[in-house]
UniProtKB/Swiss-Prot annotation:
One of its GO terms (molecular function) is cysteine-type deubiquitinase activity. Residues 736-1258 form the USP domain. It catalyses: Thiol-dependent hydrolysis of ester, thioester, amide, peptide and isopeptide bonds formed by the C-terminal Gly of ubiquitin (a 76-residue protein attached to proteins as an intracellular targeting signal). Forms a ternary complex with RSP5 and RUP1. Interacts with RSP5. Interacts with FZO1. This is Ubiquitin carboxyl-terminal hydrolase 2. Has an ATP-independent isopeptidase activity, cleaving at the C-terminus of the ubiquitin moiety in natural or engineered linear fusion proteins, irrespective of their size or the presence of an N-terminal extension to ubiquitin. Hydrolyzes polyubiquitinated 'Lys-63' polyubiquitin chains in RPO21, producing mono-ubiquitinated RNA polymerase II. Removes ubiquitin chains that initiate proteolysis of FZO1 and inhibit mitochondrial fusion. Keywords: Hydrolase, Phosphoprotein, Protease, Thiol protease, Ubl conjugation pathway. The lineage of its organism: Eukaryota, Fungi, Dikarya, Ascomycota, Saccharomycotina. Its EC number is 3.4.19.12. Disruption phenotype: Increases the amount of polyubiquitinated RNA polymerase II subunit RPO21.
Length: 1272
């Protein structure tokens, strides 16, 4: 045995040297890829040592698992069937990748997978009958004959179905290219025996054969000009080696193609007929005859088994040979030898064609190569012959010829089964692939190809392929993950889906699609250089136009940002997209299960309750809260949000900015005062459009940073409360409060209201009139001076002058004091409440320097908060603090003591700064003052307004006199409008009686249940049909002829309950808008407006009919049943057992039930229609006058009463347009900033209700100046 091993090793080395010389020659010519490798390998269990003989028990390629491409047998088979299609492709994209020159056998799946689905693959054609000649061979290994075997399989590659479509004549057949496949599989049987079967085998591409394999595959020549493409693959488990070779078609020269055409055959036959008269010219050979003759010529030497058998030669004069082909090609093209002999009897020379001797092809490698070429020729002739036979007509006489029968007898098949047999696949796999219908179109999907996966692979096999490819090719892991994800979803495989979910990987396709969603070309950018700021900026821009972004596009953008956040490992991007506010505000409120009208405290409570009940909805609740905070622009809600979700502070905290960045964001410099910074911040916060959801968080972070750097108490308090703390402001930056001097805080509201009206305030502050001035004026004018339609007495004038001076002193103190609040004089309160017909006694002495208030020198400052029991006027809202403290006045002792150091009393102790007043001091006793305050508590606020304005008018000189000698002055100019009332007899419409009246305010009635302020105005100005003794039936119309500068609207809320004999207050909400338009109520001749009014009236009548019908259908009878309920109860009764036992016929009962059900359905249908029609009509009515905006008014003041008719508390909201449109709440000495939502709070059950609204005409908003402070 040792001698045999030495001889074997010597034989191998000799053969190796021959191969080296051959390779050197090939390399010089073509650059061979086959290189020499060390003679060692690795055992499955142990490492072998260099120089060992191949004993068949060692791995020759221990590191093959690190090679790419990695393919399975299914993938290799599909590559074989598609390779020539790529090589012949003219697709520019295929050519751009060079696949038309290289083929795909050695290429990565990623390079060609996208083209595969559009390719119709070839078929694998093989000879089934191995008796005729063998296309399958088995050889012992030269390097390890004991254990290793080489299996060789030859077949053809073409698409018979496509070929049949392309041929219409016999001449077309030779144009069909039939390619040839040779597959050599070296099996290491000992390693296969020890193999652990763990699923689908993975084969890795091999560039360099091991020496032991080169010996066994020495017929392989990469430089062979007939070789189109090849690939060498080795399994990672047993090193099973597959050598795939694809060859060009045989008989591929033009002259060979032409020789099989009908013309060439006929010409050749006719030529032989001339030489041989025995031939019949009408019996021209068919193409099948030619193919079959040539097939027999090449088959002959393949069937010779031993040298003992005689060699079958061909006579050169053979008629079939000479008529079916050019006999010279046997020697010039096909390797035959011509042998000539002389006949001794005739001296004629006989020539024979001797085929190559192929008996020793097993041992002689050159002979083996020749044999394989003959096999290829035979196979091509067989399949050409069968194509040619298929063109014969069914009744063709050629069907019975020897050639056709011979070709038909050759058993061929188009099946992939031989491939799997060759590779030794498992029986189950072979059975699976034995049925061609089991092949799935999924196998042509790019994602399946990229993972070298077939549709029937188990989840484990797919995962193994993914892991191997990802490990070998990490740069393309994204593409492999795309493939895995697609396969998992396509197959619906739970294990795969779960596995994908555990992978922290971004698919390449998903990544590129995400970038394309962001309009970034992945081919033109370096993805690793994209930062979160850029991506977030693009996302904000793409989602900014809500009207153009569809829900699907938005979803895709969000998913793209999530994916990019994961890819860039950006926690901020992930947080941003997860917490992005809802697009629809209603969704946020629905998430928290609250109504949009609730206040912020309820929102916070609802949020806390929701997350406590459903912790899993924490993220949804965070988004909802975030959405509402943005909608309300509520700093308080943002504070609550960051407390409940600290992640917001992590990404939008002040530490993310430096001081200069914070200043830059607010567009201020470092020298700006805190007040200026807050002013600009509030402009940005409340006035700027919402372009980016997180802009409020960024602004808040910037302001917080500034507050920290400056250690600013003012900014810190603002950040905590959302309002400016007046105590932190310099006095000149905040209005002055007014102390309550006796539960008359509606007087304080009224005084603040008048102070905010700049023209009136300036007039009062500049007032210098005396009684003598008026006497002189009246003497010179010659007019009878009337106010409110009556003459004014001297006493009233003198009293009014004193009132204006008291008011002037208060206003002066409010402008110039350094304190937070001032206390009005009791004389001012007395004169404001005491009716104008009550005479006031003054001291005789006048024209002297007096204090600012003009009070008696012995008067004392009082601050009473006593509660009074009064007789209540049945139409008034009373300002009364209850003893139990409920609904009480805010001006309590505690509050007053708290602000005592900030109070400034307008009294004789104040430095007057030289104000002179040619007035006399009113002599008012304590009892008179108490009585006046008592009257004030019983008065409606409008009575006080009338009293105050009457005194201002009485103490003012007229600008002019109207026709009725009514004084026209600043009060009339600011507050009064006129209406025209027309009485039109229906029987004589030309006899119209009109009356023009002045109005100070419009009274709207909440008792009519108006749905909004326009609905209330409609009731006020609606036409009324009356019956008058003088005219009979008439229509009364009211319209505004002159609109005031300041429009005052009184809301009637107190009514008298005649059953309970007591007043009550209606707290029904009356929604009002910040801007209203009064065009529809104007006295006009505009035909368009008149037509709209008429149309609207008709629509309202129609609406009234529909609502009456709706009420009728929903009304309940004495038993509490609606009409529908009654029908249902009747049905229930008729279907009961009681009725069934009565003599009543079943048919009649069924008819009644059917009728009742129809009635129920009809009611439901009618109610649904009424509901829709009413909503539609109300919506249309609400927009009837949208185009009429000549008389526009802007809201600036809202008087509030909280409590019931018999007690409660007053305050006022005033808007400051000069300070970013903020609303302030004036609650006696306390003035605070409030959010707009507090002013426009129309919640049901809210006892703090508006009762007096004040609007200013658009264009004159500058006349409203709530803040006026001048400090020295």
């Amino acid at each position: 045995m040792p001698n045999e091993d030495n001889e074997l090793q010597k034989a191998i080395e000799n053969h190796h040297n021959q191969l080296l010389n051959q390779d050197k020659e090939n390399a010089d010519r073509n650059g061979s890829v086959i290189e020499d490798l060390p003679l060692y390998g690795t055992s499955i269990n142990q490492q072998s040592t260099p120089g060992d003989v191949d004993d068949g028990k060692h791995l020759l390629y221990p590191d093959i698992a690190t090679n790419l491409p990695l393919k399975t047998s299914d993938r290799l088979l599909d590559d074989i069937l598609c390779d020539t299609i790529f090589l012949n492709s003219t697709d520019p994209k295929v050519m751009q990748k060079g696949l038309q020159s290289r083929g795909i056998l050695k290429e990565s799946m990623l390079s060609y997978s996208t083209f595969r689905s559009s390719i119709r693959p070839n078929c694998l054609g093989s000879l089934t009958d191995q008796v005729v000649f063998q296309t399958k061979s088995e050889y012992d290994s030269i390097s390890c004959p004991k254990y290793n075997k080489i299996h060789v399989f030859q077949a053809v590659i073409f698409n018979p179905s496509l070929a049949e479509q392309q041929i219409s004549t016999f001449d077309d057949i030779v144009k069909i290219p039939i390619y040839h496949l040779k597959v050599s599989v070296k099996v290491r049987q000992e390693l296969e025996r020890l193999k652990k079967h763990v699923g689908v085998t993975q084969f890795h591409s091999l560039d360099h054969l091991h020496e032991y394999d080169r010996v066994d595959l020495s017929t392989f020549d990469s430089s062979d000009p007939n070789l189109l493409d090849y690939g060498i693959y080795v399994s990672d488990d047993t090193n099973k080696l597959i050598l795939i070779e694809i060859f060009k078609p045989e008989f591929n020269s033009p002259e060979e193609h032409e020789s099989f055409t009908a013309d060439a055959i006929k010409k050749r036959y006719n030529a032989m007929c001339v030489k041989n008269e025995s031939l019949d010219k009408s019996e021209t050979p068919s193409q099948v005859d030619c193919f079959y003759t040539l097939f027999k010529i090449f088959k002959g030497p393949l069937t010779r088994k031993s040298k003992a058998e005689p060699t079958k030669t061909i006579d050169s004069g053979n008629l079939a040979l000479n008529t079916h082909l050019n006999p010279e090609w046997l020697t010039s093209k096909y390797g035959f030898q011509a042998s000539s002999e002389i006949d001794e009897e005739t001296n004629e020379i006989f020539t024979e064609y001797v085929p190559p001797d192929m008996v020793d092809y097993v041992n002689d490698l050159e002979t083996r190569k020749i044999r394989e070429s003959f096999v290829r020729k035979c196979l091509q002739l067989i399949f050409w012959g069968q194509l040619s036979t298929s063109l014969l007509a069914p009744n063709s006489p050629l069907k019975n010829t020897k050639s056709v029968k011979g070709m038909s007898s050759l058993q061929t098949s188009f099946s992939t089964l031989p491939w799997f047999h060759l590779l030794g696949e498992s029986r189950a796999r072979i059975l699976l692939n034995s049925n061609e219908q089991t092949h799935s179109p999924l196998d042509a999907e790019p994602h399946f190809i990229n993972l070298s996966v077939s549709h029937y692979y188990t989840d484990r096999d797919i995962i193994r392929n993914y892991e191997s490819l990802s490990s070998l090719d990490p740069e393309n892991i994204g593409l492999y993950f795309d493939a895995l994800t697609y396969i998992a979803n396509r197959k619906g495989a739970y294990q795969l889906i779960a596995y994908c979910g555990k992978q922290d990987i971004i698919g390449q396709e998903a990544l590129e699609n995400a970038l394309l969603m962001f309009k970034i070309n992945p081919k033109e950018c370096n993805i690793s250089e994209l930062n979160e700021a850029t991506l977030l900026s693009i996302y904000k821009y793409e989602t900014s136009n809500k009207s153009q972004v569809t829900s699907n596009h938005l979803t895709n953008l969000k998913n793209a940002l999530r994916l990019l956040a994961k890819y860039t490992k950006s926690d901020k991007l992930k947080f941003y997209v997860d917490h992005e506010p809802y697009r629809a505000l209603s969704q946020a409120y629905d998430t928290l299960s609250i109504d949009e009208s609730v206040d912020e405290d309820i929102i916070k409570t609802a949020y806390s309750v929701k997350i406590n009940d459903s912790p899993g909805l924490k993220l949804d609740c965070d988004r909802a809260l975030y959405t509402i905070a943005i909608s309300k622009r509520s700093l308080d809600l943002f504070n609550f949000l960051t407390e409940e979700c600290p992640q917001f502070s992590n990404y939008y905290g002040p530490e993310k900015l430096d001081y200069q960045e914070a200043l830059k964001l607010l567009q201020v410099n470092e020298n700006a005062s805190d007040e200026t910074i807050l002013k600009i911040f509030k402009q940005k916060w409340f006035d700027e459009n919402v372009y980016e959801p997180d802009q409020f968080l960024i602004l808040r972070a910037a302001l917080t940073k500034i507050s920290i750097e400056r250690n600013s108490t003012l900014i810190t308090n603002f950040l905590l409360t959302g309002t400016i703390d007046p105590n932190s402001l310099p006095p000149e930056n905040w209005p002055t409060g007014i102390n309550n001097i006796g539960n008359t805080c509606y007087l304080n509201s009224l005084l603040q209201y008048y102070f905010s009206i700049a023209p009136l305030r300036r007039y009062v502050l500049e007032y210098q009139k005396t009684v003598e001035n008026f006497n002189d004026h009246l003497s010179n004018s010659g007019h009878i001076r009337r106010i409110g339609g009556r003459e004014i007495s001297r006493g009233e004038v003198e009293r009014s002058i004193q009132f204006i001076y008291q008011l002037r002193n208060l206003f002066y103190a409010m402008v110039h004091t350094r304190e937070r609040c001032v206390t009005p004089s009791k004389e001012l309160a007395y004169l404001a409440f005491a009716p104008s017909n009550v005479e006031v006694e003054f001291e005789v002495e006048g024209n002297k320097v007096v204090d600012q208030t003009g009070v008696l020198s012995d008067s004392k400052k009082e601050t009473t908060d006593d509660a009074f029991t009064t007789k209540i006027k049945d139409t008034s809202l009373i300002d009364l603090e209850m003893e139990d403290g409920l609904n009480g006045d805010v001006g309590t002792d505690a509050n007053r003591k708290k602000n005592e150091s900030n109070d400034a009393e307008v009294s004789e102790n104040e430095d007057t700064t030289g104000l002179t007043s040619p007035t006399r001091v009113a002599k008012i006793s304590s009892d008179q003052l108490e009585n006046a305050l008592e009257m004030g508590r019983q008065q409606d606020v409008t009575e006080c307004i009338g009293n105050v304005l009457f005194q201002i008018e009485s103490g003012s000189e007229p600008i002019r006199y109207d026709e009725d000698n009514e004084q026209y002055d600043l009060v009339k100019q600011l507050f009064y409008g006129t209406t025209k009332q027309s009485i039109v007899p229906l029987s004589a419409t030309n006899k119209v009686r009109t009356k023009v009246e002045r109005f100070l305010s419009l009274l709207i009635n909440i008792g009519d249940h108006p749905k909004d302020i326009y609905d209330a105005f409609d009731s006020y100005f609606k036409d009324e049909y009356l019956t008058m003794e003088e005219y009979g039936d008439v229509i009364r119309t009211v319209a505004v002829t002159t609109f005031p500068t300041i429009l005052q609207v009184q809301i009637q809320r107190v009514y008298y309950d005649r059953e309970r004999l007591m007043p009550f207050k209606s707290i029904e909400p009356l929604p009002f808008k910040e801007v209203i338009y009064m065009d529809r109520y104007a006295d006009t001749e505009n035909p368009l407006l008149l037509a709209k009014k008429k149309e609207t009236e008709e629509m309202k009548q129609k609406l009234k009919v529909m609502k009456n019908r709706q009420r009728e259908l929903l009304s309940r009878d004495d038993s509490g049943l609606t009409r529908k309920d009654a029908f249902l109860e009747s049905i229930k009764l008729l279907e009961s057992d009681t009725i069934k036992k009565t003599p009543l016929k079943i048919e009649a009962a069924n008819d009644v039930i059917k009728t009742l059900r129809n009635n129920v359905q009809n009611i439901d249908n009618e109610l649904m229609k009424l509901y829709n029609d009413i909503n539609s009509l109300e919506e249309k009515i609400s927009h009837q006058f949208d185009d009429f905006k000549e008389y526009g008014y802007s809201l600036f003041s809202v008087f509030i009463h909280r409590g019931e008719a018999s007690y409660g508390h007053y305050w006022i909201y005033i808007k400051d347009r000069n300070r970013n449109g903020i609303w302030r709440k004036y609650n006696d000495e306390t003035i605070s900033e409030v959010q707009e939502e507090e002013v426009f709070n129309f919640n049901e059950g809210n006892t703090a209700t508006p009762y007096f609204l004040v609007y200013v005409k658009q264009g004159q908003e500058g006349d409203i100046e709530p803040l006026k402070r001048i400090l020295k």
